[in-house]
C-alpha cells in the first residue's frame, strides 16, 4: 500500500490533519540554488550594472537573465542599485535570482518592476536576508497618485520559492502570485504606505504554501483571490495592516481547499474578511484556525454586500464548509463593529459554517454584538437546519466578556503607521511571526552565521595549508566542478554569490528544498 506523505505525517501527529486538505503536492524548486550556481553564475556587474544608485539595473539584469535562463544563478551583489526600466524575465527553466543588494525604483512607468513568467524550477531569495526592493511609493502618493508600478509579480511559474526578501513602499501592489503552482513563499517582510490599494501579497494559484511573513500597509495582508485551490497560509504577522482576506469575489468564483492558520493581526482593518457584492461561483472547504487579534476594526467579517466594490451581476457567491476555530483577543469597539459578522446572499445562503472556540472581547465599552444573515451552521448567530432559506439580519448583543479571550501580543507591534507621503525605512525580517510559533526555516543570514562559526572551528584545527585552501573556497566563486556555492556570514568579497538555500524545514522535506505534501511515497 502506498501512503501519502502528508497523511503519514498527520497520523504521526507531526502536522495537523486539516492541512492535508490544503496542499495537494510538493512545493518549492526542483533543484537547489547551489546546483544552479555551479552550472553557471551570471553576475549583473559583469553585464554593466553598477552599485552607484544611478545606473539603470534593468538592462544588465535582463542580459544576465538571458545568459542564465536555461539553468544558472543570476546574482545581484550587495550594494545600492537604481532601476528605471522594468524587466520581464520569461521562459526560464532551472534558474535562480539572488538579490543581496537593494533595488531602488527610479523609473515612473506602470506595470511590474520585476516580472517572472512562464518559468519552472525557480528560486528568488537573498542570501543575507537583507536584499530588498525599495519602491519609494511616497513619491507617487504625495501627489495622490496610486497607480504607479507594482514591485514583484510571478505569472505562470511552477515549482518555485521566494524567500528572505524585503519589499518596501510599492507605488501599487507589492507581490502578486498569478496562476502559479507548487510554490513556497516564506521569511519575508513587506512594508507599505498607510493607504488602500497597496496590497501585501495577493495569490490566485494552485498548491501554494505561504508562511512566516510580516506585512505592514493598509490594504491586503495575505489575500486569496479567484481562482485558487490548495493554499496554505500560516504564521502571518499583519502588523498594522489591512488584514487577511478572500476577494474581492465576482463572477464565476472558484476557491477551494484553503487554510489560514496561526494568523496574528494588530491594529488592522480586520482579522479575516470574505468580500463580495453579487457575483457567482463558490468558496468551499476553508479553515481559519488559530487567529489572535488586538485593536482591529473588524474580526471575522463575511460580507456578501460589501459596499466598497461595485455590484456584480449574479445571485451571489456560495460559501460552504467554512470552519472558524480558536480565535482569541480583542477588537477595537465591539458595539460599533462586533467580532462576528456573517452576511450571506439571500438567494444562495451560506451553509456548513462552523464557529467553535471563539472568544473575543471589546477594548472600548462593555458590549459587543454578533450578526448573521442567511447563514447556516453551528455557533453564535448561525441558524441550524438543512433547509437553507434566506432570513433577515439577526443580531445578538452581549455585555459580558467570554472566558478565555485573553491572548498574547507581539513585542514588535507598531504604535504608529508610516503614512504615505514620506520615505519608509527598510525593515529587517523578523524571526517571529506568531506568538509561540517557531518559523519553519531559519533566515538565510542566521544559517550563514552558523556556517561561518562552524568553519572557524574547523579551520582552527587545520594545517596552515588546509586553512589557506578553505579561505580560497570561501572567497571564490562556485567551482566549475559542480561544487556548491560557499556559505558565508554575509556578502562575499569580489562580488561573488553568498550562501545558497536548501529550502525550509517542514517535515517531509523533498529533494533540494522541494517540500513534499500529499504525493505518494
From Swiss-Prot:
Disulfide bonds join 42-68, 221-238, 344-350, 372-381. Its main location: secreted. Glycans are attached at residues 145, 239, 321. It catalyses: Endohydrolysis of alpha-D-GalA-(1->2)-alpha-L-Rha glycosidic bond in the rhamnogalacturonan I backbone with initial inversion of anomeric configuration releasing oligosaccharides with beta-D-GalA at the reducing end. GO terms for cellular component: extracellular region. It is found in: Secreted. Residues 462-521 are annotated as: Disordered. This is Probable rhamnogalacturonase B. The gene is rhgB.
